[in-house]
């Protein structure tokens, strides 16, 4: 399978992607990681309004193969939760970067997206040459 690695995304070591938009961070899980999980059957996300610290779990993704936790790459308040993914887990599998985003985070402090991997760096980590 060939994966998409859009240039406007940055990635955490734990496969979450971050898209910075107007001071907010849209967070989801990379196509690569979702493909590794297989068929997604259940998604649970933290509540809107939750304040969490960097590295804390903000959700769980359950597939036929495994149950994986997803982690916040930055501290802040979850200002939006993608309920469509909770109601329709296949959205996460079919379009993880588009309709399958998970949460929108309002960072607690100014964040440095450059602390995360660029798309190119992430791609070289997960796709053998």
UniProtKB/Swiss-Prot annotation:
Identify the cofactor(s): (R)-lipoate
Provide this UniProt record's keywords sorted from A to Z: Lipoyl
Cofactor binding note of this UniProt entry: Binds 1 lipoyl cofactor covalently.
PTM annotation (N6-lipoyllysine): residues: 65
Task: Kindly indicate whether the keyword Ribonucleoprotein belongs to this entry.
Answer: no
Q: Which GO terms describe its biological process?
A: glycine decarboxylation via glycine cleavage system
CDD domains linked: GCS_H
List, alphabetically, the GO terms of the cellular component aspect: cytosol; glycine cleavage complex
Lipoyl-binding domain spans which residues?
A: 24-106
Which SUPFAM superfamilies is this protein grouped with? Single hybrid motif (SSF51230)
Subunit composition and interactions: The glycine cleavage system is composed of four proteins: P, T, L and H.
Which PANTHER family does the record associate with it? Answer: GLYCINE CLEAVAGE SYSTEM H PROTEIN, GLYCINE CLEAVAGE SYSTEM H PROTEIN-RELATED
Please give the family membership noted in the entry.
Belongs to the GcvH family.
Summarizing the function annotation, the protein's role is: The glycine cleavage system catalyzes the degradation of glycine. The H protein shuttles the methylamine group of glycine from the P protein to the T protein.
Report the protein name in the record.
Answer: Glycine cleavage system H protein
Recorded source organism is Prochlorococcus marinus (strain MIT 9215)
Lineage of the species this protein comes from: Bacteria, Bacillati, Cyanobacteriota, Cyanophyceae, Synechococcales
**Gene, per the UniProt record:** gcvH
């Amino acid at each position: 399978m060939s994966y998409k690695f859009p240039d406007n995304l940055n990635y955490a070591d734990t496969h979450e992607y971050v898209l910075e938009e107007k001071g907010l961070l849209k967070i989801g899980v990379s196509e690569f990681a979702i493909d590794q999980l297989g068929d997604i059957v259940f998604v649970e996300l933290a509540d809107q309004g939750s304040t969490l610290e960097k590295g804390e779990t903000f959700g769980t993704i359950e597939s036929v193969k495994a149950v994986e936790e997803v982690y916040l790459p930055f501290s802040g308040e979850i200002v939006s939760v993608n309920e469509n993914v909770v109601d329709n887990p296949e959205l996460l599998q079919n379009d993880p970067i588009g309709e399958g985003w998970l949460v929108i985070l309002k960072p607690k402090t100014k964040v440095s997206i450059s602390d995360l991997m660029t798309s190119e760096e992430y791609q070289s980590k997960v796709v053998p040459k």
